[in-house]
Amino acid sequence: MVRGKLIFSIISLLMPWVAAPVGAQSQQPLTPEQAAAAMPDDAEAVPADEVEETVETVKLGGEDKTTVQEGVQQAESYEDTVAPDSPTNVEIGGGGGEEVTTPPLKTDEEVMDPTVHDPSRVAYASTRPNARTMSLTVPGPRGLITDRDGHVMACSEVAWQPAINFGQLKDESEANILSIARKTIGAFEAAGFKVLEKTDSQLLDHYRNRRWLPLAIGPTVRERELKPLREKVKQIEYSHLIPLYIRNYTSGMTACHILGYTGAKAKLPTGPINHNDPIFERQEGRAGLELKFNKQLTGKPGIWRLMFDESGNKILDELQTKPKPGGTIVTTLNLEWQKAAEQSLKKNTLGRGAFVMVDVRTGEIVVLASAPNFDPNKFIPAISQKDYDDLRNDPNTPLVSRAFAGVYPPASTFKTITVAAALRYGIISENTYVNCPFSVRIGNHDFKNHSKFTGSINCVTALVLSNNPFMYQVAATRTPHLGAQRLCDIARRFGYGSTADIPLPDKAGNVPDENWMHRSYGRGFMAGDAANLSIGQGALLATPLQVAHAISGIANGKYLPKLQLVRQVLDAEGNVVYQFTPAVQTNLSDMENALAIVRKGMKAVVNGGTGRRAKLSYVSNAGKTGTAQWGRPSDDCRLAWFAGFMPAEEPRYAYAALYEGKPHQRISGGHMAATVVREFFESIKTSMQAALTVPQAGAAEVPTDELTEEERLMKEQEEAAEAAEAAAQEVRQREQEKRRSRSGWDDGRSRR
């Protein structure tokens, strides 16, 4: 006979569907079409000229001192995998926007214990003047995390723990208590449950101090796992199933680095029952959005009341206050596209890469995918040490998001910034043709091209061919030229070198300045640094999120939008407590003409240049390839990029794809990364076509303060003075390089 059991009435959430200048200009410059005609057209093999897009960074001295780390760094412990636990500041925004409501609550679970809610017992208890009342807390279910359309990605569900329910035994001898406990544990194990080791002292201590509460003797079991075992449980004397809330990540591994995971806030108390003891473990966010919005997601606890008579016998237990669910976090992600991106990475990479897509007008992040990933459900309710060690020791670092926490040289994708900067400062125009040899001599170093091409080209063709000597010259050797400082200043305007201010632990990457150079290399900027930076190498490091963000500014043409990952935060009643509003991060109105020319070059890259493998069947596309060495030189590893925007004529989305190669692998952005892009967009053809027919969401308001004539003249004078100072600084740098060369310093070794 099954003993009377303490059954907690519990509320569950319904599962919703759930270099020196080389000649000024050739007499016969190449057009983009002529340049593209010379490109190989093999769509499968990796042509030599694409593979050789990788050009090793030229070391000018002091580089061995630097502490900048590329790639991803694995956490050393469980605690290191989570972001710092700081309070979440949620701005109170205006209402409006898409309404998302929390799902309705189920009715109370059936209560089988006749003492619960029994009016006669309540009346009897009220007549006992010496009765003691004890209130316990019932942790509330955590709220939902959804995609932009309300599709649930994380929710709470009811699960069960096998337990012993002693109650008040007539025979309270230690032998009888232990006999009952061991028989019950054995019966659960025979029924197919996993059980936990319990010592005799633990069993006896629980009976003496907490016998009116069930003792969990096994790990949590989800409803689908429990279903075939329920009938067996009914036959086990002193058995009990403790209902509790646990987290369910409905799409498994999808968006795991964004969602994060939860863990027990503290172990259940032992010893005598105290007021406000939880009846099961409280869960708290440990990583990702679960951590950042832990306060908003945490449910409001209910109150369970126990009453004992003067002899210590339980005379009443009831749910006095129902627990309430937490709020809802509505992200900017598109769940379908997120899944498609992760699938494309899995299919078209060696298991290591990233894909990011951003709305170019609103800054909403619609895809933030990284490979490899992990199943956050393994952390629920607690991950085993073995499973965690397997994840932590995996050389592919699945716990780290390459999309926002991996830093890499942006390689030739950064040439879009170099060209934009050169156009912005008047170093070149679209009609400026530069004679480009195979290599450019800067100081005592030869800065080479990735192919044997030579000729006179303009900036559009330079992007099509991904030509290095063009970039070297406009950045370092032409008169006038950009210089490293101005190039880095422009890079920062496009989001490089700083975190994105999203609710995730993203990395800032690195954009050097004079102070950084002195701290890291023991010297200031040199002309060779400008050359290295111009092709996205040297000390420049960025995340895939930053690269996609920068491209969104180019595609937008007027401003760099502020990135957003959360659309709305709702309270438990469905009231909007935060509403996303598009915002401008950087006003780029002074670069509109320059960015239009860059977009022209990026269109040509896909139509016939190094990025033609990214061409789509149903919509125009534009982009830029990139390939670079990264990591330790001894590893001989390369990475491939493809970053762009679509549609090419009226840009809606900017994106960046990253492919991490294995040691000694011959790769190129135009082959590997472009394939990731094409496979992704073709797989979402139907939904993307539908999305492109919907009017685009409102853009951010760009400041339009017009300058007075006096202010305009002052601005021109400031820019002229800035250009003169930059030119003078370059002259000083060249003089320094000559002196160092005479003293034998610039042989590449660090200054001692």
Feature-to-residue mapping (PLM):
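Sec-dependent N-terminal signal peptides
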Residues: 1-26
